[in-house]
Amino acid sequence: MPSEYASKIPTLIPLEKAGPKGYIRMVFPLELGDSYDADEIFGILKQGLEAAKERAPTLGCEGIPDTEAKQAGVLKAHKYNDYDTIIKKDLRAPGAFSHTYADIKAKGFPLAAFNGDLLCRRFTWPSPGERLPAADLQANFIPGGLIITGCFFHVFGDAKTYYTWLETWAEECRRLQGETGPRNEIPDEFFTDREKHMKPSGRNAGKPEDHSESNWRL
């Protein structure tokens, strides 16, 4: 069963509120062979993602202005239901994409083969007025394979966060294809420990002069 916290919209901790409002862009190439059903594969990806959102609540959230914050520019997490977290782009037609999967693989997956403007849904830094989903995914179907790109909002997570989201998503996709057995549930501590960072404990003054080990000047 998903954690009881999975249905709750998380409150951002101070460190997250201070994080850069940009996106980390990741690329995941997957070999599929010459004849595959793009619609079937995309259906599994989309259904698996919706199931993953039930287990990792932030995955289905976006950043919106926190009107109750004392500081300007602060965001809060808002669960949306009117935005497609993942979209499909079919690049198998002649001239749509300049490489086959076999070409990219043979060359060692060179960075030049992955055109960010074509393969990703957004740039690193959002433009004014753009929505700010925690994850913006695109499934790019090319001859012989699939290139999944993920743009992850840095305010809502770090490398561990993204790994957990992707691990959960992958597990749900496998289950849709017949995998059985217990789920690798996200520990409750991932949710409950956040509360410990919301306010000072009062046990420490938090003065810089009390921490000489972190006051190096180079």
Located regions from the model:
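Non-catalytic N-terminal regions of enzymes
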Residues: 1-207
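Flexible, P/S/T/G-rich "lid" or insertion loops adjacent to the active sites of thioester-utilizing
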Residues: 204-218
